[in-house]
Amino acid sequence: MTRRYLFTSESVTEGHPDKICDQISDTILDALLTEDPSSRVAAEVVVNTGLVLITGEVSTQAQTNLIDLARRKIAEIGYTGEDSGFGANNCTVLIALDKQSPDIAQGVDTAQEQRQASSDERFDSIGAGDQGIMFGYACNEAPELMPLPISLSHRLARQLAVVRHNGQLDYLRPDGKTQVTIAYEDGKPVAIDTILISTQHKAAIGDISDDNAVQERIKSDLWEQVVLPVFSDLVIQPDSATRFLVNPTGKFVIGGPQGDAGLTGRKIIVDTYGGYSRHGGGAFSGKDPTKVDRSAAYACRYVAKNIVAAGLAEKCEVQLSYAIGVARPVSVLVETFGTGKVADEVLLDLVRKHFELRPAGIIEHFNLQRLPGERGGRFYQEVAAYGHFGRNDLDLPWEQTDKADTLRQEALATTQA
């Protein structure tokens, strides 16, 4: 019997209050790592009407004007006017930063393996910056090997920003959210059930001021200039049965930090797989790569994507866990949900053989401390909105599939042995 079900994921635009915070946090991280690649950073940001608070823990030799960084990022997002209750030049920016705890630093600077003289390997030098669990996922539903609901939600959110920035829909404002519901049959996406877009906008569009007429115009414009371009290169398409909802409250004029307070790290499902995969709970933005919440989650995605790209599974989830101050993972798990072409235990052995999963190894393999400097001071802030994974618009080291051929060949050899 065919099993039919619906699955939904959401995304948000760069002007969403929580995403403003994520982007400021990662802009700070980019600047500090550009000047001092060994910086230890945990930058948290809060925004509200007229206020930006930058807090957390930072240990660095870099000398950077964080207030200017925050204002420039806010202006880049699009909050430049004074009529929104939140603007780059009229908000108050407060800074309350401490240094990284020496109790934490000693475990990161020298991992337990070297403190106890149990290993002199180079990658055993740095301990994990915290305990925790991290997940990575890949599947063959979308070209970028991501689940289709989050892939489409991100595409819609990015296109919302495109038509705002280029002036096609100049009445749009920065805040917005998207949501896509996909119908599945026996685990395969078969239809677009619902598309939801909530976008901040001016109260009037030209000479149109009636609320209902404004919403009708927005809905028509979004279908033509946001939805249709997003689906132009996809096999799956919205049809006559697809519900299209736009600003269901009836209007969305008050938005951004004037409408809701924002906080770094509050959109972790948007940042990852849209709820399609499990999540360890750790946020990414504002954290330097010694924090395994970030670097190990990138490594998990890298492993899972290479397994799927190799054709060894249709779906793959990888879990890592760490102990603070210890270099080697406490556990590694590979799960293919019955779609694997070889046993999960075989894949696990291949992962242990071909992927470096100690923090120092992950940092070196992905060049995570130096990429901001090599890319003109802009690296982490580029993934702080519209997802950290499946970003074909960016050159991200954890999205490479350079190990797929090796995995495929060695997995095939095990089946022939």
Curated annotation (Swiss-Prot):
K(+) binds at residue 44. CDD domains: S-AdoMet_synt. It is an enzyme of class 2 (transferase). It catalyses: L-methionine + ATP + H2O = S-adenosyl-L-methionine + phosphate + diphosphate. Transmembrane segments: none annotated. Its EC number is 2.5.1.6. Keywords: ATP-binding, Cytoplasm, Magnesium, Metal-binding, Nucleotide-binding, One-carbon metabolism, Potassium, Transferase. Mg(2+) binds at residue 18. Residues 100-110 are annotated as: Flexible loop. Its cofactor is Mg(2+); K(+). ATP binds at residues 16, 175-177, 251-252, 260, 266-267, 283, 287. GO terms for biological process: one-carbon metabolic process; S-adenosylmethionine biosynthetic process. GO terms for molecular function: ATP binding; magnesium ion binding; methionine adenosyltransferase activity. Binds 2 divalent ions per subunit. Binds 1 potassium ion per subunit. Belongs to the AdoMet synthase family. Catalyzes the formation of S-adenosylmethionine (AdoMet) from methionine and ATP. The overall synthetic reaction is composed of two sequential steps, AdoMet formation and the subsequent tripolyphosphate hydrolysis which occurs prior to release of AdoMet from the enzyme. This is S-adenosylmethionine synthase. It comes from Synechococcus elongatus (strain ATCC 33912 / PCC 7942 / FACHB-805) (Anacystis nidulans R2).
